[in-house]
A protein has these predicted regions:
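Start-transfer (signal-anchor) and selected internal transmembrane alpha helices
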Residues: 1-23
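Extreme N-terminal leader/anchor segments
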Residues: 31, 39-49
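Short hydrophobic helices that act as membrane-entry/anchoring signals
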Residues: 3, 7, 46, 133-136
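Helix-to-loop transition at the C-terminal end of transmembrane segments
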Residues: 24-38
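Interfacial juxtamembrane loops and adjacent helix segments
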Residues: 50-141
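Short alpha-helical segments used as structural interaction elements across diverse proteins
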Residues: 5-7, 37-40
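Conserved aromatic-histidine-acidic binding/catalytic patches
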Residues: 4, 8, 29-32, 118-126
């Protein structure tokens, strides 16, 4: 046990430090600047759509793991496609406006669906994606 602070105070200090570190980390790594960010996004959409367990299927004749999601998701991701591995390219108001326009047509319940492979993130438990999935679900409502 660490002395100096009551346990309740320690909890609040740790929570505050984690929130500050998380905020700084999210500012240091802009949206879609990481190589597998699109796969994390697809996993969030899958969970928000009620797909807790990834699908295993053949995609272009090869085994693939992922999910059947709204076909127009690609439109929502397109504005960010040139960001990964290009640290000189930043998210701009123009990119965000285009993404907002394209996401406006996005519906989690769209009957037009296609299979998206996301083999790396489909291995993860849904638990880390619950808050983002809830936000996506509330935003779509």
């Amino acid at each position: 046990m660490v002395s100096g602070f009551p346990s309740k105070m320690r909890l609040w200090l740790q929570t505050g430090m984690i929130l500050i570190a998380g905020a700084l980390y999210s500012l240091a790594t802009p949206p879609f600047q990481v190589s597998d960010e699109f796969n994390h996004f697809l996993r969030v959409v899958q969970i928000a759509s009620g797909g807790w367990i990834p699908e295993k299927t053949l995609n272009q004749g090869k085994p693939a793991t992922g999910g059947t999601l709204p076909a127009n998701l690609e439109r929502a991701m397109t504005p960010f496609r040139n960001l990964p591995f290009h640290v000189n390219v930043k998210t701009s108001p123009r990119i965000l406006e285009q993404a907002d326009r394209d996401a406006g047509a996005l519906s989690l319940d769209s009957p037009d669906r296609r299979f998206y492979p996301f083999p790396n993130t489909s291995l993860y438990s849904p638990a880390p994606y619950l808050s983002q999935s809830l936000g996506l679900k509330l935003g779509a409502a």
